[in-house]
């Protein structure tokens, strides 16, 4: 990722779709870059690994479990995670 892309992530609203290993890694990276991160996964909240839920909660990351945002136009970037 170029330096300009990195600096451009500050305060951008990012939705990460899929919270497997690569989704968690993407969330970590986007938080470090200063993005406003939201995540979405088809699992119900109780099916999600408790450690992952703590990780997301501690970083004030909005989660859409078994749901999706009503208005996708609010996001500056979507990251599709394969798993």
Model-derived segments and spans:
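N-terminal leader/targeting and accessory segments in enzymes
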Residues: 1-83
